């Protein structure tokens, strides 16, 4: 998602969730 010029990618996998 792009908010205020900041791009965030939420990755959900078997290890859990992380935001990059």
Swiss-Prot record:
Keywords: IgA-binding protein, Lectin. The keyword Glycoprotein does not apply. It comes from the Eukaryota. One of its GO terms (molecular function) is IgA binding. The keyword DNA-binding does not apply. D-galactose-specific lectin, binds the T-antigen structure Gal-beta1,3-GalNAc (Thomsen-Friedenreich-antigen-specific lectin). Potent and selective stimulant of distinct T- and B-cell functions. Shows a unique ability to specifically recognize IgA-1 from human serum. Belongs to the jacalin lectin family. Tetramer of four alpha chains associated with two or four beta chains. This is Agglutinin beta-4 chain. It comes from Artocarpus integer (Jack fruit).
């Amino acid at each position: 998602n792009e908010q205020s010029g900041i791009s965030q990618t939420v990755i959900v996998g078997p290890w859990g969730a992380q935001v990059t």
